Curated annotation (Swiss-Prot):
It is found in: Secreted. It comes from Bos taurus. Disulfide bonds join C51-C104, C63-C103, C72-C89, C74-C91, C78-C93. GO terms for biological process: positive regulation of lipid catabolic process. GO terms for molecular function: hormone activity. The keyword Cell division does not apply. Pfam families: Resistin. This is Resistin. InterPro entries: RELM (IPR009714), Resistin-like_sf (IPR036262).
Amino acid sequence: MKALSFLFIPVLGLLVCGQSLCPIDKAISEKIQEVTTSLVPGAVRIIGLDCRSVTSRGSLVTCPSGFAVTGCTCGSACGSWDVRAETTCHCQCAGMDWTGARCCRLHIQ
């Protein structure tokens, strides 16, 4: 009988807290929300994304210093490309006439 009552307690807890948060979980969630609401918008406001497009003749193009590749494009209807060292786009088709890259960096305003 004692074993049965010990099994009943966790089940009762699940029934009480099943769909909604328990009071302690709700209090913790509210506190986390309160703290992050005041911190995150302030941090996000001062961080910006600076992006630019660069092109070059041939099969390689490199982003300016401090920028990283976010996408590549190739001439001659070539759709095969790869990113090298996070800063250079390489078009893999033979006889490339041009290669382009979209380069971005985070900056603090």
